[in-house]
Swiss-Prot record:
Keywords: ANK repeat, Repeat. The keyword Repeat applies. This is Putative ankyrin repeat protein L897. Pfam families: Ank_2. InterPro entries: Ankyrin_rpt, Ankyrin_rpt-contain_sf.
Length: 322
């Protein structure tokens, strides 16, 4: 047998290219394993071979080659929960990316092989931790296609794999992430109360206030004071005045009042969130506030910011309404 002669770093790429060659040329004649190994040897030496063989024989040999390859580079049994003789194109891209064979993976997808990034990341997270993941997405692979990075980022936050999300936004790959995915990552960070991710992104990117609207409201509703303050600070100092004025029409203060979060109320008012509509909510009885102490505390904050004459004028109406 000539298998030991084959460099294990090249073997997987060779057999995959052979498989594609067979499919492209519709080769279906029979061949034995010895002849197949001779064919591989000839390809390594860049020689042309006229040997023909059937697809089944080759695919079985491909799977044998995969075992040979993975045993050479790691102790991880990549086939533990996988249908061994699946002969599915996705199977090969899954294997290549899972073991960090990036050149092979790029070759596969460039030749139309499909892959499921969610399946790959979930497997890595469950079985491999960060070791193989870092090997796959190391900053050395900065020529990695943007679509692959964004697919991976989206799969990471969609599957709630926090450490993978954190890795991407701290790596040099972050410049390749689309605006839509960045906003989704911030929204995910708000949901899991990870202020570090948010701080990194708001420092690296300039957002329009409207980008913040949904995630900002969610931060207030989550009672997350630190994240709300971080977002407010970014809005105040990294957006233009016109955008900020539009943003101030949000209902964040209403949520803070309903949740009786006085620190949040004070924070929002101090950052110049408009309070006119809050007084209006009181007058219309739109807020379910039946505790006089609670109402007094809210009005105290409003008095400090809003025109005192207007606030005092409305005070009696508000109290009577409740």
């Amino acid at each position: 047998m000539k298998i030991p002669r084959i460099n294990h770093n090249d073997l997987f790429a060779i057999v995959i290219k052979l498989r594609q060659y067979i499919q492209d040329n519709k080769i279906d004649n029979e061949i034995n394993i010895v002849d197949l190994i001779d064919l591989i040897d000839s390809m390594i030496e860049n020689k042309t071979s006229e040997i023909k063989f059937d697809t089944v024989t080759f695919e079985i040999f491909t799977d044998i080659s995969l075992i040979y390859y993975t045993n050479k580079i790691s102790d991880i049994n990549i086939f533990l929960d996988h249908n061994f003789y699946s002969r599915d194109n996705e199977y090969y891209t899954y294997f290549a990316l899972s073991i960090g064979a990036m050149d092979v993976f790029k070759w596969l997808i460039s030749h139309g092989f499909s892959y499921d990034m969610s399946k790959i990341l979930n497997y890595l997270h469950k079985n491999c931790g960060m070791s193989i993941f870092r090997k796959i997405f190391d900053d050395d692979f900065l020529n990695m296609d943007n679509s692959i990075i964004n697919n991976a980022v989206k799969s990471a936050y969609s599957n709630e794999i926090e450490e993978y999300v954190d890795y991407f936004i701290r790596s040099n790959h972050v410049v390749k992430i689309t605006r839509e995915n960045i906003i989704d990552v911030i929204e995910y960070a708000v949901q899991i109360n990870n202020c570090d991710i948010i701080k990194i992104l708001v420092k690296k990117f300039i957002f329009w206030a409207n980008d913040y609207r949904k995630i900002f409201i969610q931060a207030v509703r989550n009672n997350n004071f630190t994240i709300t303050k971080t977002l407010l600070h970014s809005i105040m100092y990294r957006t233009n005045k016109e955008t900020l004025i539009k943003f101030n029409k949000n209902e964040a203060l209403k949520y803070a009042i309903m949740m009786k979060n006085y620190d949040m109320i004070e924070l929002l008012i101090n950052y110049n969130i408009q309070t006119d509509h809050v007084v209006k909510y009181h007058i219309e009885g739109a807020l379910d506030i039946k505790n006089d102490d609670h109402l007094d505390k809210i009005l105290k904050y409003i008095d400090e910011i809003v025109c005192k004459k207007c606030s005092k004028k409305n005070r009696e109406v508000v109290i009577i309404g409740f």
